[in-house]
């Protein structure tokens, strides 16, 4: 189900141990610490391999996340805002990642720009609670979604390159 490249990426992202969501205030801080450590490691690995593709930050409570992701296509960088909330039932429930500016531009998206992850990602997430976290959601959810959807949207002329 998972190809060698994805397996290698996953093996380099630390697994999380604390089973806590935003409702468990006393141990949520520990879970957030693990989330940040995994994200930092994932971003470092991406930079070292020349595949740096996103930046994220959160509100003080760690319940709202936002940032930018980008996809390179024909040597052009397509950049998008990305956002998601941590569900109250996290980590049992995976975050629903949204790319708001692409809302309504592809069938593989729900209202509000939330990307469709039900068939491939959510069963994998469910088997790996609480070990998977935000870095895993980015690697197994958003990254493959961008890799499939962005070239298709470009080829169909639905999105076009914007000069900076």
UniProtKB/Swiss-Prot annotation:
> What's a Pfam family in this record?
UFC1
Q: What does the record list as GO biological process?
A: protein K69-linked ufmylation
Active site as annotated? 116 (glycyl thioester intermediate)
Q: Which InterPro entries match?
A: UBQ-conjugating_enzyme/RWD, Ufc1
Which GO cellular component does the record give, naming just one? cytoplasm
Q: Which SUPFAM superfamilies match?
A: UBC-like
Source superkingdom: Eukaryota
Q: Name one GO molecular function term.
A: UFM1 conjugating enzyme activity
Q: Which UniProt keywords apply?
A: Ubl conjugation pathway
Q: State what this protein does.
A: E2-like enzyme which forms an intermediate with UFM1 via a thioester linkage.
The record's comment on protein family reads: Belongs to the ubiquitin-conjugating enzyme family. UFC1 subfamily.
- The identity of this protein, by name, is Ubiquitin-fold modifier-conjugating enzyme 1
Instruction: Identify the species of origin.
Output: Drosophila willistoni (Fruit fly)
